[in-house]
Structures are given as structure tokens and as C-alpha cells.
């Protein structure tokens, strides 16, 4: 059957890896020339700046740029703690050539979105500025490189610039002071104890952020930002590297640092033989955890032996993680209480080692990974290559090229034995710079308790009282009896989208698209109409737990711990789908007990998280307390009927005739079609239809948006004050121009997000970021009905000014409805959308989603090509018609007009003390409309499993 030509190239490339010759290696041979990283045009300018330039065509007409600076927070003095990060912020605010965040506006105007395509990061040792820009016009690359040149020596540090940026930096600081941030900071300080690193977290100190003078920031910038400590990296779809090198010279060659090159000091982290213990109590923690860390000297990666040792270490970590996963899936896992069982893993390896079978599984996995990298060596993302060169500059990590690395791994991996891997465990002794830390929501473990556990494990090891690892039996084949292949009863070609659609003899519809984006990637997903929305409310809770219970029991006929040892190729994946449809999951009391215990722990964890409490209340409020959006409570979990849950899960994956499966990737039809026919076509069709729903007869989700303005505070106990705001508006799209309206609301979401960030961050300096999201997922998949949903604005801020910022955000949206956006605003969001579309057209994920949307679209009437064409034409019509006037009209039409007449505003705030609450009762009228305290509800969100992209479709 002639499908799409040229697919035999994948087979040839795989044969290319398999025929890759083994090397005769000298262990002392150097990996490569440190001064000549593979693939790059590499050099140094007279002023000390290093450059790396490389041609790479993925994605097409794009370039990944970076300025890497060997300057981080560890260089700060006590009164400068946080200044390195502040400098990074100021870079995008103003330079000699750019003011008032003009850099951000310019980059957005060429389609480089703020955040994803223009960003920076500060660590203890370095600062990295990153840009991802289009280069289809010659001047764009030059302008982008000129911006990096400005960052190198022309950042403006004035009092006005600093004052405007303090709020954004402070909000980033506040956002880091949640449970996760506090635990990470505490662990960092414990690990780095005795070193300057322990007291130089990049985010800095609140008092410095709020009050550091501009002169101090400028002094730090001028002292440390020296060109000899910088490198510029450019990887992209360039005609040639020489032109790019010339651009770098044009923009950087005349730059001069204002002082002599500073010597970057080294701050050693002292080792210690005694084990350090710490018990950290975090009332908002999601659960209890123990972290065991070992400090080791950094190993140079210079010789083949160094590389072999690195592979052995990686194999050790893979094998140990596999054991940990398998322990977590046992009937009595030791992870719900402090137990010796989890701590003997490394000691067991020292005594008994890993088995050859375990290491053969790890070796096969790593060989598969390097084979995939080799096959896709010409399809590596420019951002990945850019990051390699950044690490070469900052940490002297060798860049040796994937061809050489594949040859090395193919030669070395078979030579690394189980005993070689097991030997690595000798480095992980509690006398080798070991730090053990417990983290709990309530104090239970003590340092003495942990010290006794370590002592007991050491004694058991000395007495050789630790039993060997008990291995599970792994089946030779996932499908023991191969099914009889089905037939193709109908075939259609859609050349306009490059897909082939098959109807199989069991009724399953399979659509596939062959691509050459990645030589070793195939994605697939499947859907069927009818899901949880079709159930009565009384069955909802039990049935919604079906995928969770089935996932732990073994929805493919095997435990998850058994399947993890199998390599995933197309045949294996299709076999798992066959098993999904033919396995009858039956709940066992012991297994179900473990699953429900884990679910209860998850609910309790979410009760402790203020942000989950907040999100649950937002959903309750915006969707009329609908059971579909309400969090599951522990009392409801305890009423779950496991048998009903599993029966529902089994019924969802019983009738193949209700499913459409879409496959996208580098498919060789001569290999893929027989597998599709055997494992998808071989799924038996039941004698009577099961859950066979007509799309137009499905129910929408039961929800109603408040008809009146609703403003509410959610007050939650917090260790440190946090504040999150969600401002939400109802939307309704009418059927007459539905395709254009769906695209239009996407553009409006991006417009609102851009303007809110510009207004609240760049103009008022009070937020770090904002997100605008659109929800239309509660509607039934109808061809004719209107769509209703909501559009929400989310940001975090200082609790003291949250109400003020809500009012400012509302005023900005009112202004946009009244005056409309500028042409500059419209041009920027059109450019961002177009660039994202162009990037997506080169990705399998994008095409998978596009085809699924084609099938699920209201215009789909059996012709996928026509559906995709109508959707794309709607997108193009929307782009052509979008202008300041049409955007203004859409804001008035789709949102309430004026927007202040119907909305919800929910604000997460720290819980007040009882005395504060009592006193506020008498003054609540002066607080304005935000006077309602809410009941805090515990919840668990999204307990579910996506299994190889197969799900039952319940709502669009």
C-alpha cells in the first residue's frame, strides 16, 4: 500500500547506528580539545569576550541566543544580597539605547514573547540572558545581538529604574517563599554550611530588595560585569556562521569594561566525615519526605575514563531509582512512615550488588536513548545546542558531538558490568559528606531517631544481615497470545493535511500522519465520546477514581513495576493498548486499600496548601458549586465503591468501534501497518455496543457563572504572607461566527495578558507576571449550540495592595473596551501568534493536536480534510480582520460590557489572627466590598491517569 514516500530512511538511519563501529579506546585519551567545542565557530575578541556560533536548522528561521556571565550571587557582599538578580531585572528595563522596557516591546513586536522567548536567570555562580528570535529578516538577528551587547556593559542603573523594578523583584521573592521554596532554601543552606554559598541565595534578602541604593547596584555591575567573564552564544538557522561572527564583532568589539578584569574568587564547600542531620517542619508541606545527600568533589570530564565513570554513575542512579519505584508499588510500601526499609537500599547494593539482569535493563535503556539522540542528530533544537555551549563556557563541560558520543557509549556500555555499577555505592556512605534531612508538616521525626536509623542500617550492613534484592518475574512478551490481525474496511487520503484515515474491521478509526520532524518519535492518542459527564451525580465520585485504582492494580494486565523494565517502541505501545482493551481490572482489597490511603494522603496534603484551597474555592464560586468542579473530600473518598470504579473503567475501554486513534511521527508504513492491524485491529468488538454515544446527544457539564458581581477573600493559614488574585469574566460565543470567535478569544486572551503585564508590572511595578486563560471546556460537543465559559486574569502580589491592583486591572480592561488597543498592540500579538504557529508546524505534538481538533470540531461531518481547512481558514480570516477597532468590538461583544458589570474577584490572603478579625468586624465597612471571609475547603484535584494518550472524551 503506497502511503507516503521516503519512509524507508528511518530504517536506513537505524541501520546506520547499528553499523556504527566500536572504538578501540585508550582510557587516558582526552575526550576532545577543550578550546575547540565541536560544531561551533569559536573565538575570543580583543576585549576578552568569547563567542560560539553554530548553524542549526531546527526550528527553521529561528535563532537561540545567549549572553552568559560568570557572575552570580556568591560574589555579593552582605549589603548586596540580591543585587546580582536585580541587575538581571534592570537589563530588560533600560540600557543606554533602550528605556522604559522598550527591549521587551521590541522583542514582542518581532514575535519573541516575554517569558518564553526573552528571559534570564541568576544562580550563585552565573547570570544567563536568553533570547529566541526569528531570523527570516536580516536585520532581526543584528538587533537581537545588539541587545545582548547592551546587557554586557550598558545596563542603566538609575534611582528611577530601580524603584520601578523593586516591586517585580519583591514579588518574585515573595513567590519563592512558599512551602517548596522554604524547603529548598533550607536544604541548600544545610548542604553549603561552612561556605559563603550558604548565605548567598540568588533571590537575596527582603531588606536589600526594598532599600538597596542604586549606587550599590551600579558598583556591583561595573565591578563584576567584565567582558573577559562573558560569552555570547548564537545557534540558529543562519546562512553561514561568518556573517554571525561579523555581527558579534560589530556590536561587541567596541565595548569596553570600565575596570580591570576582576579575579573571580573560589569559595570552597568544606567536606565533613560526620553525618549532618536536620528536621525541618513545614506546616504547608504536601507531605513528609527524607532527603539523603552526599557531597563529592566535582569530577573533571576530560578523558575516556572520566566518561566511562560518568556512565557507570548514571547506570547506578537508573538502577537505584528502578528499585525505589518498585518498592513504592509494593503492597506495604515503607514511604508512609519513618522506616529502615527505605534506607537499606544503598547498603544492600554494597553487600549484594545489582544483578546482571537489572544492569542489562539499564544498559538497554541508555543504549536506546543514545540511539535516539544519534538518529535525531540533525534535528536537535537550537536551544539545546545553545545550552551545551553555555555549559562549556561556564563549567568547562566538553562538547564532543553526538556522533563521537554515540560511538563512545556503544563501545563502553557493554563493558560496564554489574559489579562496576555496584562499586559506585562505596561513595555513598554516611561518612562521606552525608546530609540527612527530614521534612514534615508536623513534627514527628527527631535527629536522635534518624541517627538511630543510620546506626541500625550500618550495624545490619556490618553483620551482613541485609537480605538480597527480591526480583520480580518479567514476562518475555506483553501479549502472550498474539491476536488475529484485523482488516482495513475503508481508507481515505487527505493530502491537504498529509494524513491517511483507516477504518478497521472492528470499527476503530485510525488516522496517521508521517513526518520527518524527529527520526525517532511517534506520538499517538485516542478518544471516544462519552465520559464522566454522562454519569449521574451519585456515581461520579466512585467512577472518577476508576483510572487511579486501575493504574495501581495494573490496567495493562501487569503491575506498573513490571512494565517499567520494558523499552517503549511502537510495537510495545500498541501492545499496551491491546492489553488495555482486553484486560478486566478487578479490585483486590489489599491493593485498593493502598490506593485509597495514597488518595487520602493527597487530600490532606492539599488541605495544607493555601494555593489549592484557593483554587478549589475559585472553581466552586465560578461554576456554581457544581459537583464536577468540587474537590473530593476524605468523607467522599471513604464512600468510593472500588468495584463500581473498576467496572466503569473496564467499560470505557471495551468497545474499539467508538474510538478514533491518531498517530503522528516518523512512521514506516511497511512496519507500522501490520502492527496497527494486529494490535488495534485485533481488539475484539463486543457483541453489543458499550458506551456508544452520539456526539450531539452528550451532556454539557453542569455549571453556572454568578449573575452578579462577586468579590471574596479566601483567608488561609500561612507561614509567610502570600497573595494570589483571580479576576474572572463570563463569556459566550454565538454560533453564527463560531470558528472565528474561538480564534478571536485566543487573541483577546493574549492581548489582555500583554496589557495587564505592561500596566501592572512595567508601569506600576507591582507584579512579577500575569496569566490570562480561557475556559470553554464545559460545553457539550455540539455542531450548533452557543459556547459559554470564562476568561480569567491571574497574578500574585503584595497582600496589602491586592484590592488596589484588582481595581487597576479592571480599569485597564475598561479602557481597552472604551478606547481599544493600539495598532502596535495588535501587531505584536499577531506576530507572536504567527511565530508560535510557524514553530508548531515543525512539531509532532502540534500536528497531533491539530488533527484531534479537526475531528472534534463542530464543523466535522466525516471529512477531516474539510474540517481542518475550515478551521485554518477561520484562523486566517480572524488574523486578517483583527485591528484596533475589531479587537475593541470583540472585547465589548465577548466580555460583559462594561466588564465591571459582571465578574468574580477572588483573593487569597493570609489568615488574620482572631483578635485582628474581631477588631475588623467593627471597621469592615471601610474596607470596601472585599469583606467576606470564606470557609476553607480541603480538596484534591485531577486524580486521573492518561494512559498512552487514550481517554474517553467527555467535554471539548
Curated annotation (Swiss-Prot):
The modification N-acetylmethionine is found at residue 1. GO terms for cellular component: chloroplast; plastid. The keyword Hydrolase applies. GO terms for molecular function: metal ion binding; metalloendopeptidase activity. Keywords: Acetylation, Hydrolase, Metal-binding, Metalloprotease, Protease, Zinc. Zn(2+) binds at residues 85, 89, 172. Its cofactor is Zn(2+). The active site is at residues 88, 165. The keyword Acetylation applies. It comes from the Eukaryota. Binds 1 zinc ion per subunit. One of its GO terms (biological process) is proteolysis. Its EC number is 3.4.24.-. Belongs to the peptidase M16 family. This is Zinc protease PQQL-like. It comes from Arabidopsis thaliana.
